[in-house]
A protein has these predicted regions:
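N-terminal beta-alpha lobe that positions the nucleotide/phosphoryl donor
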Residues: 1-117
Length: 117
């Protein structure tokens, strides 16, 4: 069972993931860029961490290293990417594997193959 999950997404996608994680008994962690500091997903999570640099909100959600850093710092048991952003990117799945953090999604090799069309 997971105790704490980083949701690497925003908006309604993140809010629905928080709801599911909470129903399973897990604490939730939001990541957000400066521009999303008043967003609902940040306020609905049990914990939230600012990522990225001001002026580049989308880039923040694509920074797999920063997201993994947050997971390590907050002691998360897993990272869930939602969809879009890093959900189909093998870099996040690979970084999770390298840090021993479960990635809730396909493994990096599968994502790499799926993206090589």
């Amino acid at each position: 069972m997971l105790d704490k999950v980083v949701i690497a997404n925003r908006g309604e996608i993140a809010v629905r993931a928080f709801r599911a994680a909470t129903e399973l008994g897990a604490k939730t962690v939001a990541v957000f860029p400066h521009e999303d500091r008043k967003s609902e997903h940040r306020l609905k999570a049990d914990e939230s961490y600012e990522i990225g640099e001001p002026g580049h909100p989308v880039r923040a959600y694509l920074d797999h290293e920063d997201i993994v850093r947050v997971a390590v710092e907050c002691g998360a048991d897993a990272i869930y990417p939602g969809y879009g952003f890093l959900s189909e990117n093998p870099l996040l799945a690979g970084a999770c594997a390298a840090h021993g953090i479960p990635f809730i999604g396909p493994p990096a090799p599968a994502l790499h193959l799926a993206g090589n069309k």
